[in-house]
Amino acid sequence: MQVEGPDTNFVSDLALGSKKRRLSKTSVQEDDHTNVVSEVNKNKKKKKAKPMTCTLLKSVVEKGIGIKDVRDMTQYLLQAENNSPKWIDICNRSSLQKMIVLFIPGLQPDDFENGKNTFNEISDDNFKYIPGEIASTFHTFPVMAPGSKMTLFSPYNSFINVGLSKMEKINKLKELQKKKKITINDLVLSEQQLVANDYPLDSGDTNFDTDWVQTVDFTHGGSHIFALDCEMCLSEQGLVLTRISLVNFDNEVIYEELVKPDVPIVDYLTRYSGITEEKLTVGAKKTLREVQKDLLKIISRSDILIGHSLQNDLKVMKLKHPLVVDTAIIYHHKAGDPFKPSLKYLSETFLNKSIQNGEHDSVEDARACLELTKLKILNGLAFGIGINTENLFTKLHRFEVKTVLLNDMIIKNHTEDDSKGQLIRCVEDDETWTHIHENLNKDVKLIVGRIKNLERSRNYNKKPRKETPSFDASMVLHDIGQHLTQLYENATPGTMILIMSGTGDTRPWNNLSTELEFIQDKKERLDKRREREPEIVEAIKLARGGVASFTVK
């Protein structure tokens, strides 16, 4: 009888089947493990980032917080600065989605609950014009405007100008020195510089009356670069134009006129202007309007005007022009910002010429500005400047932070828009609020704007360009409260809203400084300042005491 051997195929099949089952089981286990890991990772991804929190350190705040400190906090929140502020404890700054900074000059202590006499006494009081449940999320604290016991500087300028470290200054100087050859176009003020220095721009601004004119484009021969200087006398309404001198790039006087004032003169300021009643009576043949017409035939909108603090000349001429070289800006004061060098100092230091000895001469001053500009072109951008500050927005753009700046001094119908920032003209508060609401949920990290109607309603603004419409402070405050409420309700979580007055009550200081400005003799003005020093100190103290309030949704 033959005994058959085992079916090797069958055994193989059994073994293969067993292996397949083991592999299948292992595969399932591995799949299950993979799915579990995947689910865990998914849950980790779904886990929300911790919200940002900001806690005021009152013991530090009470010692004094300035606009600079708020600016540095802004840089830290936007991750353009690694040094955390010492006066506020910030956790999870990476969760910040957007920051809105609003300057609202004109705020007073009694606009807040339990309002005291000064902002220094405020301790987390709520803004009265926001509903309680939202107002309770705001944190209020005093902020000092820049200055000293005898001086007050611009809070807005302090916020938008960042001090540089020693190494940053060295690097900036090296960068400027790279471009050894420059043209006059490299010295023309940028829009942000025009805004920061209060240059009168654009015919559509309702803050300018109908007496203002604007240069227009036209073709002409000869020079396309002019230096300009004016002399002024004092009327009850302020300074008025009484002499104008225009010099071309070849240093030739091409326009020189004494101007008939259209209002009575109360002080000819002869010791400075060189103007006397007799000179004007005999020599002044043209009115301001006629001078404006002459200039519009000489200066095209595409030409360049050179002057020293030229915004003052343009204002008294009631003339708007966009292309300006300002020797008070292209050369720096030895003390740095916010000080501006005098033309006399620049002429003596860089031209080795003594000017303005006694009476001012507008031709001499215009020529000094022209020579200083030519000297700057020969020596490069680094010549005659201090490397102390950088524009906040310029710095933020280097860190890929998208910004929107809303300002009333930007040229009409011009929006500077690139991948990093927008510069939008807003003359009225309604326009500012509209653009803030429109950009609230757009891909923008920082929005900075100024609300002006409150200071107008309370006469905080020192020199309105024309008689502005009257505003009721209570109505303006309710409007501010309504907009802040809407912003909070519509903002995405992680949005910070920060409001700042910038200053305290500036009215007493405005009155004092106006009186002092009318004293043209330097020694007489200094003597008067010493005489009234106690009043000035108190007025400045009141003016520097501002407030800030913020919330994080």
Curated annotation (Swiss-Prot):
One of its GO terms (cellular component) is nucleus. Keywords: Coiled coil, Exonuclease, Hydrolase, Nuclease, Nucleus, Phosphoprotein, Ribosome biogenesis, RNA-binding, rRNA processing, tRNA processing. Gene3D superfamilies: Ribonuclease H-like superfamily/Ribonuclease H (3.30.420.10). The gene is RNH70. This is RNA exonuclease 1. The lineage of its organism: Eukaryota, Fungi, Dikarya, Ascomycota, Saccharomycotina. 3' exoribonuclease required for 5S rRNA maturation and for the proper maturation of the 5' cistron of the tRNA-Arg3 dicistronic gene. Involved with REX2 in the maturation of the 5.8S rRNA, and with REX2 and REX3, in the 3' processing of the U5L snRNA. InterPro entries: Exonuclease_RNaseT/DNA_pol3, REX1-like_exo, REXO1/3/4-like, RNaseH-like_sf, RNaseH_sf. Belongs to the REXO1/REXO3 family. Residues 225-373 form the Exonuclease domain. Residues 167-194, 509-533 form a coiled coil. The modification Phosphoserine is found at residue 24. Its main location: nucleus.
